[in-house]
């Protein structure tokens, strides 16, 4: 009876097991230099700024969420790949980063992931958020369906993309201001 219960619980909760399996894969990628290769790739792209890279990622994340393509998230994608690439872009342009600017880039990279996922996922007709909103509104007597919610989410997703790109442009300006001062102080 106990083994049967454990087996059925394991099968019903296998998504948790899949999540746990991604952690060693991420560790192996980090151990064998994925982070360094990502930084080298970005350093070789001369015109790629931190803000441009994060804007591209925001666009990809939002489009991916709109078609229900999951790119994992903070621990599986931002920390091992996007954040090092964004920092590599700043290092190639300005030299070494101090802790304050490193944290600024980390936070912005995480924010772009959140914006893209949060505002992009409701564009997908069958996403859980759209179905929850449609079901709740129907129960309250409003005549809406999932398609109406998804259509109403498109302008919001576009606005979120525009605001994210503006935030990234301001990030580039802030990094330029902060790190150009640091470069001059070193000279």
How would you describe each model-predicted region?
Residues 1-29, 37-41, 179, 183-187:
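Hydrophobic transmembrane alpha-helices of multi-pass solute/ion transporters
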Residues 14-15, 27-36, 66-80, 118-127:
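Short helix-coil transition sites and intra-membrane helix breaks within transmembrane domains
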Residues 22-26, 57-65, 130-136, 152-169:
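Hydrophobic core segments of alpha-helical transmembrane domains in multi-pass membrane transport
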Residues 51-65, 94-119, 144-158:
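Alpha-helical transmembrane segments of multi-pass membrane proteins
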Residues 70, 74, 137-187:
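Juxtamembrane and boundary regions of transmembrane helices in multi-pass small-molecule transporters
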Residues 75-100, 127-148:
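Membrane-interfacial helix-loop connectors
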Residues 87-108, 169-187:
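Intrinsically disordered, low-complexity non-transmembrane regions of multi-pass membrane transporters
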């Amino acid at each position: 009876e106990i083994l049967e219960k454990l087996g059925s619980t394991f099968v019903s909760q296998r998504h948790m097991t899949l999540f746990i399996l991604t952690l060693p894969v991420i560790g192996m990628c980090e151990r064998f230099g994925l982070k360094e290769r990502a930084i080298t790739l970005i350093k070789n792209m001369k015109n790629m700024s931190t803000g441009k890279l994060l804007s591209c990622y925001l666009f990809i994340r939002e489009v991916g969420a709109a078609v229900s393509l999951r790119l994992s998230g903070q621990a599986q994608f931002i920390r091992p790949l996007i954040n090092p690439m964004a920092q590599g872009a700043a290092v190639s342009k300005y030299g070494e980063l101090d802790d304050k600017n490193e944290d600024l880039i980390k936070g912005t990279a995480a924010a772009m992931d959140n914006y893209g996922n949060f505002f992009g996922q409701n564009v997908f007709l069958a996403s859980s958020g759209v179905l929850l909103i449609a079901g709740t509104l129907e129960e309250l007597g409003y005549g809406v369906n999932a398609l109406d919610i998804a259509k109403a989410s498109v302008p919001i997703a576009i606005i979120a993309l525009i605001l994210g790109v503006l935030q990234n442009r301001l990030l580039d300006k802030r990094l330029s201001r902060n790190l150009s001062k640091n470069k001059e102080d070193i000279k």
